[in-house]
Amino acid sequence: MLTNININKMNQLTSENETAKQIVSQLLENHQTIVSMISHEIRNPLTLVSSALQIIEIQHPEVINFHGWSQAIEDIEFMCNLLNELSDFNNGSTLHHSVFSLEKLLKNIAVSFAMSLDSINSNIEFTSKISLNSDNYTGDKIKLEEVILNLLQNAKDAVSEKTFTDSKGSIFLCAEKISDSIVISCTVNGCGISDDIVNTIFDPFVTYKTNGTGLGLALSKKIIEAHGGTLIVTSSDETGTVFTITLPV
């Protein structure tokens, strides 16, 4: 598995050596093909098994109480999610550009996220401040929405797992245009991350969440970098954790 340090070294090598660049490009292309083939071959029988279990559960509802039944269902769902995320990660650098209002997209996401918190009577305070003063942005709308939703969901999970004594957990989504860049930040109060985790948090298959695949943040970083931007994280016990996206305009 390549870490961010390995990738930086590889990028430096390929920028200095044309032959190395061609070799790495071919290896990456072969890797993507192999991953797609394996995912496809596994997904088909897994889908059949999942469908069969659903039919059994409908025809014989008593199986719900069988020992290990619910765990089997959860394991299959996890594998399906893993294959979907693996496929997304494999195609993370492939963008489908369109011109759209990034400000409107972010505001819609904020409204939907706030409604989702209300629907479960969450004790999480969510606020947003989105002011880009620009209607047109060129990028992959669907993948950028996926990144923001992933950051918000991670923030929600982090706050939900923490016990607050003096105040309730809060999430703040901010977006503004600074110079020639759009800066989007997601701040979670009181949920600090240790240095060890920060250093590996964007590495593929590294996860600190129960039933996590370890691909969400790795994919998010890949998508943002494909847009020519950056995704970084800063954290402390006092101020909490901030994920910051910077996109060129």
Region locations from a protein language model:
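Detector for a conserved hydrophobic position within an alpha-helical segment of the HATPase_c
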Residues: I224-E225
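Conserved catalytic submotifs in the C-terminal HATPase_c
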Residues: I109, N123-D135
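Acidic ATP/Mg2+-coordinating residue in the GHKL
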Residues: V188
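Short alpha-helical Gxxx[C/S/T] motif in the catalytic ATP-binding
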Residues: G216, S220
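Conserved HAMP-HisKA connector
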Residues: S15-S39, S50
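Conserved DHp (HisKA) dimerization/phosphotransfer helix of two-component histidine kinases, i.e.
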Residues: A52, F66-S116
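Short conserved segment of the HATPase_c
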Residues: I193-P204
